[in-house]
């Protein structure tokens, strides 16, 4: 089993790197504002038709454009969900959503979280899925990538006040990156058996003679961007465990590759844009080493399973509960780590049924800020915050002014870094405490003891860090949970983007200092170790007391 797990992980990483590097070079052209071959004339026509003036923006103007863009998208999606009962493409005649569920869902999809307090096949019309949720999957992903484009330019430029044009970046990312990749992946899914139609649900009779409905819909098109954009929201309630979303072992592999493809490519693009490919590789190495460690722990925990099962007469202690037999333990464990490392939230197994340690690792990956590959864009700008923090700590230890890529890290940057890093832990801990202190919060708990607490902690962690996966034993479809998690998703997304853009605005105005003999090398093994240590110490220790009350207590209770 260990050899199989190693081969699965090694082959996955090999294919990922082969695919991501050339994509990273294309992304570097976008960051450098170089039109892709053959598209310059098309872009000029697009800018004229859309009324886009391609002048560059300062950080505040860029930020306001991003915030306005997402606010308008959220309002449009909220209205669509409320009115879906009277709109077309609704063959099942599904009613509009309640205001609190519509608000939760709208914020969920504009924040790239895709938390779902509903079952898609029994709640959403085809119009809501296509025009509402799928469109926001593209736009929320483009938002995250645009922000990291701006931050990357801040490191590459000097003595400037502009970071690019938000409307140009959003358009290019959507049309030339997300749309072509999604089309290719969707066509592959259709070939593998994923539905793509607008038919009404199909009645059929099971072998036992029971009459049921077979759900239909435009699944493949939403499935592709759900993964490539690290969105994660499933067309069906079972998400990628559903055979209509993820029918074969081959689609499962492609789904895992799609989740990490753009976050990995952005690391290569970063190194290319700052004219030092070693910097991008160093960040990628740090992410990969943490990822490998987490995969090993989850695979070990799930294959070890629960030893008490043997005393009850089970044939094996392997933890197959909540997993699809067509994927097995190893592929399910790998998928769980990928989807929580990348703030995707799609699942091909039920995380609530993992062992205590096997479920703790995905939760912990979210709690460290979704910086191990992370969401498209958000993962890299989150890790760059930790990079600058690590440089600052190293500077304090040796008594030198901290620098990264020739840019001095001053008091202003450190204040913004601290603010951005502290946003999500504050939301998670206060949100969990509020849920546990109130009757409305505890009413959603279906399980007592440490596991029930873990379900609450996981839900708030997932929302605040814009992941969207869940421990399913929590009744979150109530006004209390809809509003609490909506607040966490909204603040967890945009209260991080705001200081990141402020940092970019400060750095782009600074001069790039030439390296001196005393300059800290930020591309070697020593710095990679320092960066990993910073992520583990700052990002992880915050949650040790909470984890001790939940998954750790549950684990030791089984010994």
Swiss-Prot record:
Subcellular localization: Cell inner membrane
One GO cellular component term: plasma membrane
Keyword terms: Cell inner membrane, Cell membrane, Ion transport, Membrane, Potassium, Potassium transport, Transmembrane, Transmembrane helix, Transport
Bilayer-spanning residue ranges: 5-25, 63-83, 131-151, 173-193, 254-274, 282-302, 327-347, 356-376, 379-399, 416-436, 483-503, 525-545
Function: Part of the high-affinity ATP-driven potassium transport (or Kdp) system, which catalyzes the hydrolysis of ATP coupled with the electrogenic transport of potassium into the cytoplasm. This subunit binds the periplasmic potassium ions and delivers the ions to the membrane domain of KdpB through an intramembrane tunnel.
Complex and partners: The system is composed of three essential subunits: KdpA, KdpB and KdpC.
Family matches, as NCBIfam families: kdpA
Name this polypeptide is given: Potassium-transporting ATPase potassium-binding subunit
Species: Klebsiella pneumoniae subsp. pneumoniae (strain ATCC 700721 / MGH 78578)
